[in-house]
């Protein structure tokens, strides 16, 4: 019996880069096939070929034994294939129902039947266990909710082959469990699934088989994942041993650098108070919707501050815009890289230099292009950013390499004092995480105060000197590194009703 999906010797070349070289593996009906590899290994490129965005330069794709050619996304969808990319694709000013039914809205005499569409979508969402308002516009939803819309869109097309690229990267624990149930149901229903994730727990929880990519090549395939130790997968992914991914080292801390007192914003229910010392890494943990990102945006001047006070090195700080924050040496690496972090149409070099250009002016008028080029080359080498050259458009880089470029932007700032990192390793492989943690430690050694927001509890525990836990828009408590463990952090993060119910 033919495999539900077969990649046959797939090759793809971009200018200066061989993105894929001889990729061949099968995905069976009723199977979840994991795809792992470092950022830039070629996983997302393969899915773009499957989804009709790219054309292979060699090899081909077979669906149910039949050779297929996908000149467009529409051709891929028509063949029963659904690809859900890490970078979400939606229309922000349309509703949930309109996004889910885009191109097939029920109509009569040219008029769209909105009530019929909303009722249909509400029934389908309920059947999938997803709690979303069909009338809500995508722009007003969280990243996690938008992710669920994309997943539901693929499921509503009744696709036989479904590929998921980092689907849980922005989901809460509850939403992740809903997704896992959906994947299990689809497997039992005989669908063929490709599942890309950097989270080992997810791969072992969901996947029957697994293929490993490195530098565009297929380095290993495992028909039965249950028999493969985790250490083997990591070694095959990165080509080296990583015994301690966090490699935490204590360091001397200075005086209080950033202090927040009774800080309030439109999305913060009560005043938030905390301190961060020079050279200290303070991890912020909380469930989705706890208010962590909202608090960081208030500090950075991206959202309005409605109350409270900030001080920097003991002096009052009045930040009314992101420009004010950067001028005082406070920077933010945002959660949503695509929308708020990178300038997609600009080059890697331009993205690295965009903030510190004021330091590259000659006579206050002319850009020192040689200096900018040297700065970009230095950080590309230092952070091991995988790019053909500094002129490459940043949108063509993997998520991990885009994140490194954003970090390079702030490393290039000579007067850096506070670095806020919102989900700095979201959707990034284990090798790139290891390198990014090294950058965070280097910033701390320089005396920067580091505030790191993360939904990955092991990361918060592994990297932070101190942990602040938020719950329902408030700071619920804080823990020193020596007293912090998963149970203590979760007890602070979970709603009190949930804790009582669990007891």
Swiss-Prot record:
Pfam families in alphabetical order: ABC_tran (PF00005)
InterPro entries linked to this entry: AAA+_ATPase, ABC_carbohydrate_import_ATPase, ABC_transporter-like_ATP-bd, ABC_transporter-like_CS, P-loop_NTPase
Entry's family note: Belongs to the ABC transporter superfamily. Arabinose importer (TC 3.A.1.2.2) family.
The UniProt record lists the keyword Cell membrane: yes
Name recorded for this polypeptide: Arabinose import ATP-binding protein AraG 1
Reactions catalysed: L-arabinose(out) + ATP + H2O = L-arabinose(in) + ADP + phosphate + H(+)
Domain of life assignment: Bacteria
Single GO cellular component term: plasma membrane
Lineage, uppermost ranks: Bacteria, Pseudomonadati, Pseudomonadota, Betaproteobacteria, Burkholderiales
GO molecular function, one term: ATP binding
Major localization class: membrane
Membrane topology per record: Peripheral membrane protein
Keyword annotations: ATP-binding, Cell inner membrane, Cell membrane, Membrane, Nucleotide-binding, Repeat, Sugar transport, Translocase, Transport
Record SMART domains: AAA (SM00382)
